[in-house]
Amino acid sequence: MQVTLKTLQQQTFKIDIDPEETVKALKEKIESEKGKDAFPVAGQKLIYAGKILSDDTALKEYKIDEKNFVVVMVTKPKAVTTAVPATTQPSSTPSPTAVSSSPAVAAAQAPAPTPALPPTSTPASTAPASTTASSEPAPAGATQPEKPAEKPAQTPVLTSPAPADSTPGDSSRSNLFEDATSALVTGQSYENMVTEIMSMGYEREQVIAALRASFNNPDRAVEYLLMGIPGDRESQAVVDPPPQAVSTGTPQSPAVAAAAATTTATTTTTSGGHPLEFLRNQPQFQQMRQIIQQNPSLLPALLQQIGRENPQLLQQISQHQEHFIQMLNEPVQEAGSQGGGGGGGGGGGGGGGGGIAEAGSGHMNYIQVTPQEKEAIERLKALGFPEGLVIQAYFACEKNENLAANFLLQQNFDED
């Protein structure tokens, strides 16, 4: 018999095989004809009529019609994180990453470039030396050596691995972004993908729900359809977040790259936990999660921004995509008690710059913008886009009006 196979990237090919052969034999034929790198047997999943084909079952048992096709989904093996040992010569380029971070951590990372190696050369004083290590670079940190030193005392040692991954240059950065976003679909490709997955035997509502839960990753959407969309199990783990992640009470604009840059150092020192767990305690990540849940199509732009500002974090995300998506799917926490207080203070002193309310779940976050930024947002709104979407796109594109306009025009605004 001749089996027609189709990938989620619309590649179609045919394999001749005896119906008495098993599914595993078909996988081995696919690997031999298409290459071990692209179609490894261990990573293949064959799907027909909404069911995963079992390796030990004969092909004739599934009654595969030669006029129909079998979907081939290849899952990449989970990469092993090796970013921790790369801690040699950190003083080359840590300052650019530290400068791009938010003011709360910029003051903490400012002393990191010069004493990055001296604290590691004197490990005799571990816990007590945290204050002395932060008091030595007092000229770089200027004032406030006491209170900031209590929270970011870890950062001088933590920033060392960051430049190790950023040294290869822009090519590696773009490769990371392509790897993280290659499987995401938007615009017309989204509709094509919905139709394609529906041809496997699923209802449109199921397909759209799975794509939304996977943030338009078709491979993972098919997994969710087959295995079930994950619930809110991981949200129970966020019961008592550590208090050290409280930056400043003032609301910050949702520039996700800055949020990512502030947390670069923490990625390599989450002892015993998942490399991405530290994001849960970052107010910027909670803001990012809220934005993405409202509009999943913004995810590629946000990943691109993270790749520019923080390639190490993007690498961690690409290596743990499933965990990252589960974290994004968690319900947004009502953190309005602390952030709301800071926002109220900013609103009370209004009259200088403009204030724009960002849509939230149950509360409003006010973002302070300059008159020029407000004019740019009004111009984007004049194109016919809703204000909430315009604000998200404008800040996601680093306040680049032209880029935000192009991004908005490329999106599909059909209500699910």
From Swiss-Prot:
<dbReference type="GO" id="GO:0005654">
    <property type="term" value="C:nucleoplasm"/>
</dbReference>
<dbReference type="GO" id="GO:0061629">
    <property type="term" value="F:RNA polymerase II-specific DNA-binding transcription factor binding"/>
</dbReference>
<feature type="modified residue" description="Phosphoserine">
    <location>
        <position position="160"/>
    </location>
</feature>
<dbReference type="InterPro" id="IPR041811">
    <property type="entry name" value="RAD23A/B_UBA1"/>
</dbReference>
<dbReference type="GO" id="GO:0098761">
    <property type="term" value="P:cellular response to interleukin-7"/>
</dbReference>
<feature type="modified residue" description="Phosphoserine">
    <location>
        <position position="199"/>
    </location>
</feature>
<feature type="domain" description="UBA 1">
    <location>
        <begin position="188"/>
        <end position="228"/>
    </location>
</feature>
<dbReference type="GO" id="GO:0005829">
    <property type="term" value="C:cytosol"/>
</dbReference>
<feature type="compositionally biased region" description="Low complexity">
    <location>
        <begin position="122"/>
        <end position="143"/>
    </location>
</feature>
<dbReference type="Pfam" id="PF00240">
    <property type="entry name" value="ubiquitin"/>
</dbReference>
<dbReference type="InterPro" id="IPR029071">
    <property type="entry name" value="Ubiquitin-like_domsf"/>
</dbReference>
<comment type="function">
    <text>Multiubiquitin chain receptor involved in modulation of proteasomal degradation. Binds to polyubiquitin chains. Proposed to be capable to bind simultaneously to the 26S proteasome and to polyubiquitinated substrates and to deliver ubiquitinated proteins to the proteasome. May play a role in endoplasmic reticulum-associated degradation (ERAD) of misfolded glycoproteins by association with PNGase and delivering deglycosylated proteins to the proteasome.</text>
</comment>
<dbReference type="GO" id="GO:0007283">
    <property type="term" value="P:spermatogenesis"/>
</dbReference>
<dbReference type="InterPro" id="IPR015940">
    <property type="entry name" value="UBA"/>
</dbReference>
<dbReference type="InterPro" id="IPR015360">
    <property type="entry name" value="XPC-bd"/>
</dbReference>
<comment type="similarity">
    <text>Belongs to the RAD23 family.</text>
</comment>
<feature type="modified residue" description="Phosphothreonine">
    <location>
        <position position="155"/>
    </location>
</feature>
<dbReference type="GO" id="GO:0071942">
    <property type="term" value="C:XPC complex"/>
</dbReference>
<dbReference type="GO" id="GO:0005737">
    <property type="term" value="C:cytoplasm"/>
</dbReference>
<keyword id="KW-0539">Nucleus</keyword>
<dbReference type="GO" id="GO:0048568">
    <property type="term" value="P:embryonic organ development"/>
</dbReference>
<comment type="function">
    <text>Involved in global genome nucleotide excision repair (GG-NER) by acting as component of the XPC complex. Cooperatively with Cetn2 appears to stabilize Xpc. May protect Xpc from proteasomal degradation.</text>
</comment>
<dbReference type="GO" id="GO:0000976">
    <property type="term" value="F:transcription cis-regulatory region binding"/>
</dbReference>
<dbReference type="InterPro" id="IPR009060">
    <property type="entry name" value="UBA-like_sf"/>
</dbReference>
<dbReference type="GO" id="GO:0032434">
    <property type="term" value="P:regulation of proteasomal ubiquitin-dependent protein catabolic process"/>
</dbReference>
<feature type="region of interest" description="Disordered">
    <location>
        <begin position="333"/>
        <end position="356"/>
    </location>
</feature>
<feature type="domain" description="Ubiquitin-like">
    <location>
        <begin position="1"/>
        <end position="79"/>
    </location>
</feature>
<keyword id="KW-0833">Ubl conjugation pathway</keyword>
<dbReference type="GO" id="GO:0031593">
    <property type="term" value="F:polyubiquitin modification-dependent protein binding"/>
</dbReference>
<keyword id="KW-0227">DNA damage</keyword>
<feature type="region of interest" description="Disordered">
    <location>
        <begin position="83"/>
        <end position="175"/>
    </location>
</feature>
<dbReference type="InterPro" id="IPR004806">
    <property type="entry name" value="Rad23"/>
</dbReference>
<dbReference type="GO" id="GO:0000978">
    <property type="term" value="F:RNA polymerase II cis-regulatory region sequence-specific DNA binding"/>
</dbReference>
<dbReference type="Pfam" id="PF00627">
    <property type="entry name" value="UBA"/>
</dbReference>
<dbReference type="GO" id="GO:0006289">
    <property type="term" value="P:nucleotide-excision repair"/>
</dbReference>
<dbReference type="GO" id="GO:0000502">
    <property type="term" value="C:proteasome complex"/>
</dbReference>
<protein>
    <recommendedName>
        <fullName>UV excision repair protein RAD23 homolog B</fullName>
    </recommendedName>
</protein>
<feature type="compositionally biased region" description="Gly residues">
    <location>
        <begin position="337"/>
        <end position="356"/>
    </location>
</feature>
<dbReference type="GO" id="GO:0043161">
    <property type="term" value="P:proteasome-mediated ubiquitin-dependent protein catabolic process"/>
</dbReference>
<keyword id="KW-0963">Cytoplasm</keyword>
<feature type="modified residue" description="Phosphotyrosine">
    <location>
        <position position="202"/>
    </location>
</feature>
<feature type="domain" description="UBA 2">
    <location>
        <begin position="371"/>
        <end position="411"/>
    </location>
</feature>
